From Swiss-Prot:
This is Aspartate--tRNA ligase. One of its GO terms (molecular function) is nucleic acid binding. L-aspartate binds at E171, R217, H448, R489. Residues 195-198 are annotated as: Aspartate. Keywords: Aminoacyl-tRNA synthetase, ATP-binding, Cytoplasm, Ligase, Nucleotide-binding, Protein biosynthesis. GO terms for biological process: aspartyl-tRNA aminoacylation. Its main location: cytoplasm. It comes from Salmonella typhi. Its EC number is 6.1.1.12. The gene is aspS.
Amino acid sequence: MRTEYCGQLRLSHVGQQVTLCGWVNRRRDLGSLIFIDMRDREGIVQVFFDPDRADALKLASELRNEFCIQVTGTVRARDAKNVNADMATGEIEVLASSLTIINRADSLPLDANHVNTEEARLKYRYLDLRRPEMAQRLKTRAKITSLVRRFMDDHGFLDIETPMLTKATPEGARDYLVPSRVHKGKFYALPQSPQLFKQLLMMSGFDRYYQIVKCFRDEDLRADRQPEFTQIDVETSFMTAPQVREVMEALVRHLWLEVKGVDLGDFPVMTFAEAERRYGSDKPDLRNPMELVDVADLLKSVEFAVFAGPANDPKGRVAALRVPGGAQLSRKQIDDYGNFVKIYGAKGLAYIKVNERAKGLDGINSPVAKFLTADIVEAILERTGAQDGDMIFFGADNKKVVADALGALRLKLGKDLSLTDEDKWAPLWVIDFPMFEDDGEGGLTAMHHPFTAPRDMTASELKTAPEEAVANAYDMVINGYEVGGGSVRIHNGEMQQTVFGILGINEQEQREKFGFLLDALKYGTPPHVGLAFGLDRLTMLLTGTDNIRDVIAFPKTTAAACLMTEAPSFANQAALTELGIQVVKKAENN
């Protein structure tokens, strides 16, 4: 039906007769001439109808936005004064000789001239996806997946599919369950990841595996999460963690070079402890120049319990955050930031305004100045590198609260005061995570997952001091987003059972949930290492949006609903009866 795409026409096509198919993006009726912007997936081109082709001109008068049409015409160069430098096709136009209206469009529920609500965009997603910026994002996503496949093929990885209907295993989030009609009362689980299957593939001898795969997690959602999402899943045998990171870093550098024309360079490597200490986060945004600086040793003897308490507590921390130019902040702004950090458990926000650095104590303005000596102030100014016009905020509490509160404040100030370089790319690897973390109930939970190996520990050493274990794990972070993560896997049955035991999984439960894995570990398991990237999040970064729904064709809302199809929906009673399922209504509160 077509000979060319609208958005691909250029001066090289001048004089050629072309047939185009697409939609009316805009129509301008000048009486004797009618102009339309005609759009397809590749872009927009101007088409005009003149009186010499009366039938086409008459039919064009009926056109409205989003009519689906076919146009045949001749490509012409525009006069210099009419060239549109903002359009890829702005140097040419098409003189239409014939027009076919394939399908008309009713009045549109989305307004092309205004910002539509996200609810409306998701309900009429098929119309929303016609917008050039949305089409471009999905085209970029397709390019990314193509680049990934070619790269992985070139590096000897095999694309192997793993099951979608599998067994429920604890991986950190709730499973989506699928009832079995054949096995009444039993359920499959949709995979949260192909984790165990890819490890089993390593045990099967496929030493380089990858897959671009759907995963499912029934968890509370936010802007950068979906109940179903896509991973670039990778596993290798007989490779070390640094070797795997080298290959995966090369993949990401390749994507940025091909999609953005940007060379990311070598990625710095930072330990979890350093990231938390300097940035208050295990996924630091290095575009932001501010850092947390420890000052507890300077404040142990002050007559101010808010500082002295945490400064003298082994589990406490006092840290300072220097904000360049922050002395301009008003009292109301400071109060607002004080309320902001309370969200993260902080009790408030002490501060020092640096007016004249050279005057030391006399050159600052601070509600806590009366508790500080000239020597202490000088030491704080020196350690933080404060200059005239800067602000220093303080966090004083247990280590987690200080990291969380000042880490979040750092990001907010970076954005509010334009301190974060939005034109920069800042990737890094974060390594050496704690193996376990407190589950809040007196037990331990795996920081990554239960199949991650500890670094340089035997099973007996791990059993003796699990809280000291460092995971042989790593995350890739770009501009404050965790885009991928992985680890060295446990390939020894004794170690795997030890980890299960530390996590409170008794031997009977181990056999019930992971018997197949424990059996497989008995038969010559190779050392293996893996990683998974979030394709949606990578695409989000590469297309410059901050909402993951913008890079998924048919996403869910933050309530895990599809507004277009109205999923989830009620199942009919016959289907439920056949599955042996009875829906129990939740009792209403009186």
